[in-house]
From Swiss-Prot:
UniProt entry keywords in alphabetical sequence: ATP synthesis, Cell membrane, Hydrogen ion transport, Ion transport, Membrane, Transport
Membrane topology of the entry: Peripheral membrane protein
Protein species of origin: Methanococcus maripaludis (strain C5 / ATCC BAA-1333)
Highest taxon in the source lineage: Archaea
Record bears the keyword Membrane: yes
Compartments, record wording: Cell membrane
Protein name: A-type ATP synthase subunit F
Length: 99
């Protein structure tokens, strides 16, 4: 299993330095969607990493992906959300609200 990365120049440089080769540097949501679709169609890729901001811009594309997609903060830090998606998943799964 290989890992694919889709991100802005500041994010992808770190993953390239870590030795990942399936790295796509994108500058627009259209480029990001195309890169994610390419990674999704590659049978050797098992995990796709992208930034939260790109994730929000191409949510429909990510929803159609059959692989694990992880969204990480970019250089500007994490996106502040009203509802933490992890808390929502836990509450739905076990019926307990995490504070």
């Amino acid at each position: 299993m290989r890992i694919g990365v889709v991100g802005d120049p500041d994010v992808v440089v770190g993953f390239r330095l870590a030795g990942l080769t399936d790295v796509y540097e994108v500058k627009s949501p259209e480029q990001a969607a195309k890169a994610i679709e390419e990674l999704n169609s590659n049978s050797e890729i098992g995990l796709i990493i992208t930034t939260e901001r790109i994730g929000e811009q191409v949510r429909d594309t990510i929803s159609a992906v059959k692989k694990v997609v992880v969204e990480v903060p970019d250089k500007n830090g994490p996106i502040v959300r009203e509802n933490d998606p992890v808390k929502v998943l836990v509450r739905n799964a076990v019926g307990v609200d995490i504070k």
